[in-house]
């Protein structure tokens, strides 16, 4: 940090984080800006995933309840239609096998169920992948922001020692600016990293529960399909 610029900030009596950023050393300024961007990015991902994962689980649960209550036709997909309901997509994935179940010969039952199982597995993987898309950014921000902030801290402390060496003075006016930069970089690194790590772990758990719910419903569908193929209408 430029000592004169820091002195001006104190003289004006209006010291703030923004002024510290504007008066910072170019390298530290780049670090601080990168951390601010990372923090904004992580909160954008957190907001989007909070609603995306919660909404996906709610819709899948609604279809599962409708299926067991005999109202699955309300969600039936027509050719060319798309849906954001994972439960409806699971049922659509085996719709052909579901229709054919009552007409295939006993020797074809195993092949029909195996084909349906592959379709369900692919659909579950695809749906979980769609909802989890972007969550890796939280892991990246959480693991790297602390080290980026640490780099800014080291650079700020180095500037403090350089100022001491150049001015042969250890007063607060000489070292205060670079030390403030160093602490600011550390703080921003933690501000960016901590929420990212917390929400990454939360969303990972939510996604695992979502995948387990879809897997359980897939197994229920396979059981019903197998019974339908063996016994006719249920």
Which positions does each model-derived feature cover?
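Hydrophobic alpha-helical transmembrane segments and adjacent short intramembrane/lumenal linkers
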Residues: 168-182
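Residue-level signal for the membrane-embedded core of alpha-helical transmembrane segments
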Residues: 31-34, 38-41, 145-148, 152-155, ...
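Hydrophobic alpha-helical transmembrane segments of polytopic membrane proteins
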Residues: 179-198
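Residue-level signature of catalytic and energy-coupling elements of molecular machines
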Residues: 25, 43, 75-76, 91, ...
């Amino acid at each position: 940090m430029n000592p004169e610029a820091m002195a001006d900030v104190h003289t004006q009596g209006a010291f703030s984080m923004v002024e510290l950023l504007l008066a910072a050393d170019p390298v530290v300024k780049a670090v601080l800006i990168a951390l601010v961007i990372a923090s904004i990015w992580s909160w954008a991902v957190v907001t989007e995933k909070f609603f995306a994962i919660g909404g996906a689980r709610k819709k899948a649960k609604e279809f599962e309840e409708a299926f067991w209550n005999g109202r699955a036709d309300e969600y039936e997909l027509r050719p060319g239609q798309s849906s954001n309901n994972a439960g409806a997509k699971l049922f659509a994935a085996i719709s052909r096998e579901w229709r054919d179940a009552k007409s295939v010969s006993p020797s074809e039952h195993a092949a029909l169920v195996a084909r349906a199982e592959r379709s369900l597995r692919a659909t579950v993987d695809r749906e979980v992948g769609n909802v989890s898309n972007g969550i890796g950014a939280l892991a990246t921000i959480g693991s790297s922001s602390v080290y980026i902030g640490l780099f800014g801290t080291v650079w700020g402390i180095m500037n403090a020692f350089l100022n001491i060496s150049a001015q042969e003075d250890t007063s607060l006016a000489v070292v205060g600016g670079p030390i403030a930069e160093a602490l600011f970089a550390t703080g921003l690194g933690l501000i960016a990293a901590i929420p990212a790590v917390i929400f990454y772990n939360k969303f990972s758990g939510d996604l695992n529960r979502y995948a387990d719910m879809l897997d359980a419903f897939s197994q229920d569908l396979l059981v019903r399909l197998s019974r339908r193929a063996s016994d006719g209408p249920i």
